[in-house]
Amino acid sequence: MDNTKINMLLNNRKYPLFKSMLNNVTQGDTIEMMKQIPNNSIDLVLVDLPYGTTQNKWDSVIPLPELWDQYHRIVKENGAMVFTASGLFTAQLMLSNPNEYKYKYTWIKSKATNFLNAKKQPLRKHEDILVFYRKQPTYHPQMTEGEAYNKGIRKNQVTGSYGDFNPVMVQSKGMRYPVDVLYFKTAEAEGKVVHPTQKPVALGRYLIKTFSNPGDIVLDNTSGSGSFLVAALQEGRNFIGIEKNEDGTLFKKKPVDYIKITESRIEQTIREMDANTLMHLHKINLLSNNEALND
C-alpha cells in the first residue's frame, strides 16, 4: 500500500482512532476496537485467536460470527485472513466460514506439549495455520533450495484427477515450491517467553512475506505479546495490534501487562535495526506514526 492511500486512511474523520492504532498496539475489546478501522483498509490478517483449550481465564473463544462481520468489512476483498489453530478450534474455525476456507498449513514445532497426558495420549507437536480469502490474495511462495533435475517431457493427459493438461517439460534449476508442512522452532528458541501461547517471530515473518507486500497493513487483533507485530515491522509492513490485556498471568503466578511488553519488544526491534533499514522504514512512513519509535 502506498503512502497516499495510507494518508487517506489516516485522515478519515469517520475513524478518528485509526491514526493512533496504526503501527501501535491498542488495548481494548477486539470487536469494539476493530470497529475503529476503516473499510477495506487491511491487507492481511495474521492472528493467534484464543483456542479455548487451556485453563487460562483469557482463553475463551471470541464469537466467530462477529469476528467475520468485522473482517469482511475491514479486509480488502483480495486480502488473506490467516489463523493459527489447534484441535477442536481448527474445526470450529473451518466450519464458521466454509465458503472462504481454502487450505491449511501444518506447523511442526520443535517442542511437544501435552506431557501431563503422555501415558494416555500422544504428545502434541504441531498446530494448524488456516488460510481464508474471498479472492486470490497476494501470494509469494517462499522457495527453498534443492537439487536441479530434468525429467524430460511429460506427455499430455486427458483423464487426470486434476484435469487435462498438455505436454510439459518437467525440470527444475534447484528451487522448490513450498509445501503445506512448515517447521519452525517454538518461541523459547528466540529468547524469553512472556506469554503462555507465544508464537515465534520467524513463523510470523514467513507468513507475512507469503501473503503481503512491503508497506501493506497487517492486523493482529489478539496480539498477545506482539510476536506477529514484531514480524510485520521486521518485514517492512505497517501493523495494527489489538490486545484486551485482561487476566494475564505468566505461568499462573505473575501478572503481566502485554501492552507494555509489546511496546518494549517493538522498541527493541527498532534499536536492533541497521541504519539502512531504519532509513527505508522512515522513507515509507512506517515509523512516523509511533511517537515512541521516534524518540
Residue spans of the language-model regions?
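Core catalytic lobe of class I
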Residues: 1-242, 246-255, 259, 294-295
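Class I S-adenosyl-L-methionine-dependent methyltransferase module
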Residues: 133, 138-146, 267-295
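Conserved SAM-binding loop
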Residues: 262-263
